[in-house]
């Protein structure tokens, strides 16, 4: 799984600017639910072959004992507790503040790896920017400018020096060649109940294997003589015990589990409907390209009218996930839970499918013969052949000419054709267009030799005589 970097510091030291630099995007997921502050952002980035997850916390005010600032401090400490590396950010222009000393003392007690980051140091010599922050006793400071992007590569390289490259990450327990299932969803939708039902229903063989991320557990189990790995983000208790409190929710763990899985079971609450946080999690699943099964829980206790109304609402709001199978279940009573596993198997098979190039090309050419792409100006785009470029999710690469002019509607037409023909149900499908390189594009023709110029002149004279 990706290592987690948590940005901590007092207000207005440039945490959000640094976050946007590290993720190269302003479209971070925002956790806007009770128990998590509004300005906690989650995003992921990559330095070369090293991926990472970044958490941007609110301004840390540890001395405040009540109100919203106290809640923000509590949530910041919770984020630190989930961190692999804490980036403690201070303001190089304002210098060392008393609040920085208090925060440093708080962070030192956590036992996490802490990197002191002196921000807003553009145009300042290293010695000038860093000298007074040695007093904090957190080691040699990293001096950066988030605004101008200065020295950020060195910062991330230092932060990730103890973590493996992408190739090594793929060798983790969650990446073995059998279905790896993550149960995702917001709090109180019944994730824990579903996990216990899955592990207890068929007297499955279960044993706990510590994961590479703190508090995540890989549970290997057998169902129908097939092996699976279930990623439990909340820390699964033995099935004989009762869940005493509302299941713990960690956005970081949820995102990491989604990325580590082959198939995600997204659990929704039939009685409370789809929330904004449900949409955030679904969007992240779609972005990462993981196969998906949707379990709409708490179906018991609803009359026929409520069920009919709820079905229509979910089908309308989940139209952007129309590739996934929907199941209406009661995790508490086990109703409909058995039907989840065949959908998980089908989604896994589709996500890991290997499609031969000749078959892909034949299907693509048949789709083009049935409906050609619209003209993009003077010429019509020409699709020549297709091949598979990846799995989990399947990536189909189409080669041809003038493909930059293929509209989005035609791309969806090809995507739906590939999905229907090759039965890729339960997984996102990505179609990428690549135009062949023209080595002469943008180049002028070489000058004619004397003999070539004489012959061209003769041809022009003959044509004038012939056609007047």
Curated annotation (Swiss-Prot):
One of its GO terms (biological process) is ribosome biogenesis. GTP 1 binds at residues 9-16, 56-60, 119-122. Residues 456-468 have a biased composition (Basic residues). GTP 2 binds at residues 185-192, 232-236, 297-300. Keywords: GTP-binding, Nucleotide-binding, Repeat, Ribosome biogenesis. It comes from Nitrosomonas eutropha (strain DSM 101675 / C91 / Nm57). GO terms for molecular function: ATP hydrolysis activity; GTP binding; ribosome binding. GTPase that plays an essential role in the late steps of ribosome biogenesis. Residues 3-167, 179-352 form the EngA-type G domain. The keyword Repeat applies. This is GTPase Der. The keyword Repeat applies. The gene is der. Residues 353-437 form the KH-like domain. Belongs to the TRAFAC class TrmE-Era-EngA-EngB-Septin-like GTPase superfamily. EngA (Der) GTPase family. Residues 434-468 are annotated as: Disordered.
């Amino acid at each position: 799984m990706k290592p987690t970097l948590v940005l901590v510091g007092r207000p207005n030291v440039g945490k959000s600017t640094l976050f946007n630099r590290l993720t190269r995007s302003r479209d971070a997921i925002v956790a806007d639910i009770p128990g998590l502050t509004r300005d906690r952002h989650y995003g992921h980035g990559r330095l070369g072959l090293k991926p990472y997850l970044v958490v941007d916390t609110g301004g840390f005010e540890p001395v405040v004992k009540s109100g919203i600032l106290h809640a923000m401090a509590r949530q910041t400490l919770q984020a630190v507790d989930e961190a692999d590396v804490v980036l403690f950010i201070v303001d190089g222009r304002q210098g060392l503040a008393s609040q920085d000393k208090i925060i440093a003392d708080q962070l030192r007690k956590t036992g996490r790896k802490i990197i002191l980051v002196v921000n807003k140091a553009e145009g300042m010599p290293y010695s000038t920017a860093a000298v007074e922050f040695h007093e904090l006793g957190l080691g040699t400071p990293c001096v950066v400018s988030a605004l101008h992007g200065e020295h950020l590569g060195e910062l991330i390289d230092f932060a990730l020096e103890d973590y493996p490259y992408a190739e090594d990450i793929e060798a983790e327990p969650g990446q073995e060649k059998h279905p790896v299932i993550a149960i995702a969803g917001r709090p109180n939708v019944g994730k824990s109940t579903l996990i216990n039902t899955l592990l207890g229903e068929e007297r499955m063989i279960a044993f706990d294997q510590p994961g590479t991320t703190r508090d995540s557990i890989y549970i290997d189990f057998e169902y129908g003589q097939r092996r699976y790995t279930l990623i439990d983000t909340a820390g699964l208790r033995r099935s004989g015990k009762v869940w005493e409190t509302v299941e713990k929710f960690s956005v970081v763990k949820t995102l990491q589990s989604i990325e580590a899985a082959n198939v995600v079971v997204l659990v929704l609450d039939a009685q409370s409907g789809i929330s904004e946080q449900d949409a955030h999690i679904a969007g992240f699943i779609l972005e990462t390209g993981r196969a998906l099964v949707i379990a709409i829980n708490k179906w018991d206790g609803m009359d026929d009218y409520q069920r009919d109304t709820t079905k229509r609402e979910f089908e309308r709001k989940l139209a952007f996930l129309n590739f996934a199978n929907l199941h209406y279940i009661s995790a508490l009573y086990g109703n409909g839970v058995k039907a989840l596993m065949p959908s998980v198997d089908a989604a896994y098979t589709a996500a890991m499918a290997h499609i031969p190039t000749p078959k892909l090309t034949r299907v693509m050419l048949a789709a083009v013969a049935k409906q050609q792409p619209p003209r993009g100006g003077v010429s019509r785009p020409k699709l020549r052949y297709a091949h598979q470029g990846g799995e989990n999710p399947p990536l189909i690469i189409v080669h041809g000419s003038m493909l930059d002019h293929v509209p989005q509607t035609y791309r969806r037409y090809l995507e739906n054709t590939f999905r229907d023909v090759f039965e890729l149900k339960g997984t996102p499908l990505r179609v990428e267009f690549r135009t062949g390189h023209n080595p002469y594009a943008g180049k002028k023709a070489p000058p004619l030799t004397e003999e070539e110029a004489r012959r061209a002149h003769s041809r022009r004279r003959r044509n004038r005589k012939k056609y007047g």
